[in-house]
């Protein structure tokens, strides 16, 4: 892109650009101009916005995740395995917030225990690759969606 960054997707953190049609128009136009997928809210949450953001994006050929999944507050390995085995076909964005337990983390967020739990699961669990493979999951990122849009 302009400064040489290899941007994989656009993300309006906390769905800020999805709350008003005039903001979403700009978000969607950028996705179309640069052939970038969007991080959109789930189909279940879309009625809260008041206009069909997912359909508008799809009509323009802009890709996005089919659904979202996250672990409960403080997840366990078994909860993660259950979540993986319960995924439906399609593209699911798995949202985790791994963080190392520090005084700063504890000061800035009330969900620090869940973030530390996510970190332990992702970093310390050496068998996670096998669990993912056994569940029949192909791990991709938004770059894969971007490349599909560009070809």
Predicted regions and their residues:
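Histidine/acidic-residue-rich catalytic or RNA/ligand-binding cores of hydrolases
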Residues: 49-55, 76-78, 102-111, 151
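Short amphipathic alpha-helical surface patches that serve as generic macromolecular interface elements
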Residues: 77-81, 88-91, 125, 129
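Catalytic domains of cell-wall/extracellular-matrix polysaccharide-remodeling enzymes
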Residues: 1-63, 70-78, 85
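Aromatic-lined glycan-binding groove of carbohydrate-active enzymes
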Residues: 37, 51-58, 83-104, 138-140
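Glycine-rich, flexible loop/turn motifs
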Residues: 64-67, 118
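C-terminal domain-boundary segment and adjacent tail
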Residues: 38-41, 109-151
